UniProtKB/Swiss-Prot annotation:
Coiled coil residues, start to end: 15-81
Membrane topology: Single-pass membrane protein
Name of this protein: Putative uncharacterized transmembrane protein DDB_G0293028
Cellular component annotations (GO), alphabetically ordered: membrane
Organism of provenance: Dictyostelium discoideum
Length: 170
């Protein structure tokens, strides 16, 4: 073998080794890249699961809080006594009674329709100078109309006289 042939064989071998080293380098880079991508995907998946878990816990806590508040509201509703409920509804009855009674011309002090709530105490606090203390839902004639009303009742009808304009504080 001549010198030129040896150089050529050495060159071919070095090229083969270089090619092999290049292939190994590319494979290592590819494996490293795949490993990095896999770790990144696992990390993202773990982060996503963590976020979903936190979200589920927050929703669960919100539902429990809402249920607790609802139970407390129901409990407080049931704690209101029937007397208080009647009292509140009687306030509305008193106001209706005043309106109906003033228009019909009857005024009387006493207990409002509906029972337990003393209407004169309620109206006295709301009256602000009004002449009428309490009006029942069933109008009672004022003194000026008593005779006319008695005659009308005896005839089978109940006719009311109009109220004087000065009672309305216009």
């Amino acid at each position: 073998m001549g010198k030129g042939e040896l150089e050529l064989a050495g060159f071919i071998l070095s090229e083969a080794f270089d090619e092999k080293a290049e292939k190994e380098k590319v494979e290592k880079e590819k494996a490293l890249k795949e490993k990095t991508e896999k770790e990144k995907a696992e990390k993202e998946k773990a982060e996503k699961e963590k976020v979903e878990k936190e979200k589920a816990e927050k929703e669960k806590a919100a539902k429990e809080k809402a249920a607790k508040e609802k139970a407390e509201r129901e409990k407080s509703k049931s704690a209101v006594s029937p007397a208080t409920t009647n009292q509140n509804s009687n306030k509305g009855n008193v106001e209706k009674g005043v309106a109906i009674g003033v228009l019909a011309g009857g005024a009387v002090t006493g207990v409002a329709v509906g029972g337990a709530y003393l209407a004169d105490k309620y109206i006295a606090s709301k009256a602000a100078g009004a002449a009428v203390n309490v009006i029942e839902l069933t109008p009672i004639p004022n003194a000026a109309n008593t005779a006319n009303n008695a005659a009308a009742v005896s005839q089978g009808s109940h006719r009311w006289q109009p109220l004087p304009y000065y009672l309305f504080n216009i």
